[in-house]
Amino acid sequence: MTLRIFDTGTRTLRDFKPVQPGHASVYLCGATPQSSPHIGHVRSAVAFDILRRWLMAKGLDVAFVRNVTDIDDKILTKASENGRPWWEWVSTYEREFTWTYNTLGVLPPSTEPRATGHVTQMIKYMQRLIDNGFAYAVDGSVYFDVAAWSKAEGSDYGSLSGNRVEDMEQGEPDNFGKRGPQDFALWKAAKPGEPSWPTPWGDGRPGWHLECSAMATYYLGEQFDIHCGGLDLQFPHHENEIAQAHAAGDKFANYWMHNHWVTMAGEKMSKSLGNVLAVPEMLKQVRPVELRYYLGSAHYRSVLEYSESALSEAAVGYRRIESFLERVGDVEVGEWTPGFEVAMDEDIAVPKALAEIHNAVREGNAALDKGDREAAEKLASSVRAMTGVLGFDPVEWGSDAGADGKADKALDVLISSELERRATARAEKNWAVADEVRDRLADAGIEVVDTADGATWKLQ
């Protein structure tokens, strides 16, 4: 089957045809390590980790680049406010992001370039834009000339976001000498006390948009397959990346993919609103694999509304899968179901893929109850294949757990097995058995909590 991707640039589902057959090249806008990561940040990493895993599962050799924006206005401001060197501030939070990615099972990128390590590439990029007539230098800063580019043959400025040029204003704070309000900084002239690098136009530091265009094309070439990022980056960041690249003569990305926000009480999760949830705090409620399951469970283009009940229900869903595989015992990874492949090939439709997994779990448990171990093992092998693609194969996660984690896991599996028995009894209206399971767990200090999506448990 052919993978189809919703391309933000054309607002259509398109067949994925890689630039180089047998290979896939992907660029993901990564972290700006100005503060601790929250689940809004991490959703993007998990969503496109699933994309990457599916491309790999289809036999493609994937070059996956995820950058680090290690210099920008917010970093400098926060470091200064806290009396710390900017590079030390960045290093602290970059380590937190790396820990978070690793903890949630996000595969390491093929390359993780930092902006400050690619000033040479940025200088060359600016020179090309100036030579082509689409950038200009003023008092040590370099700006992209939006008016000149928007009038040029082949210009598509505004097409990604749907904005009109006349309605755009970049809001650059350092706008002295700009020819137009839409123009944005490629390079910012040095200020006292700030880090700077030498260029032919004066010392300074890179603009945000220039960094990604220069690094993406340096590592993936002037034309590559997929550019990913959060929906909030669509404008101005990604719109300006496209403008720079096309004005420089590069074809740039063939497909654009954007994940939607994590919201709380209907509002986008953001530091400015004070409604962010740091990953370590979340991990006090659920295990890392359960948080990954939750973050990846919604379609990447859908809003993920956070609530404690939604997180608990996701954990219950994962534990059902885990409990089934524990019942079956050791099985090798098999083949995914045809329905799973259809779901993943249709714009990475994880909710439909999860439905395939849970159908297989239900059928497998039924087979075990009937004594058909061969059928159960075949289904378990399929479940392992499907959960592996999504990055939460319970067997793989279990093998990576420490002693404490294994003890917790064993306890959880035992209780989940009892909850499955109770659920079966309730479905058969065998209330005596259902009550017996509940009471026995209560005697052990475990409270059963019934939710719309099944039962979970907590210590009394």
Curated annotation (Swiss-Prot):
Its main location: cytoplasm. Its cofactor is Zn(2+). A motif ('KMSKS' region) lies at residues 268-272. The keyword Protein biosynthesis applies. Signal peptide: none annotated. It is found in: Cytoplasm. CDD domains: CysRS_core. Keywords: Aminoacyl-tRNA synthetase, ATP-binding, Cytoplasm, Ligase, Metal-binding, Nucleotide-binding, Protein biosynthesis, Zinc. A motif ('HIGH' region) lies at residues 31-41. Zn(2+) binds at C29, C212, H237, E241. One of its GO terms (cellular component) is cytosol. It is an enzyme of class 6 (ligase). It catalyses: tRNA(Cys) + L-cysteine + ATP = L-cysteinyl-tRNA(Cys) + AMP + diphosphate. Its EC number is 6.1.1.16. ATP binds at K271. One of its GO terms (biological process) is cysteinyl-tRNA aminoacylation. One of its GO terms (molecular function) is ATP binding. Pfam families: DALR_2, tRNA-synt_1e. It comes from the Bacteria. Binds 1 zinc ion per subunit. NCBIfam families: cysS (TIGR00435). HAMAP family: Cys_tRNA_synth. Belongs to the class-I aminoacyl-tRNA synthetase family. Monomer. This is Cysteine--tRNA ligase. The lineage of its organism: Bacteria, Bacillati, Actinomycetota, Actinomycetes, Mycobacteriales.
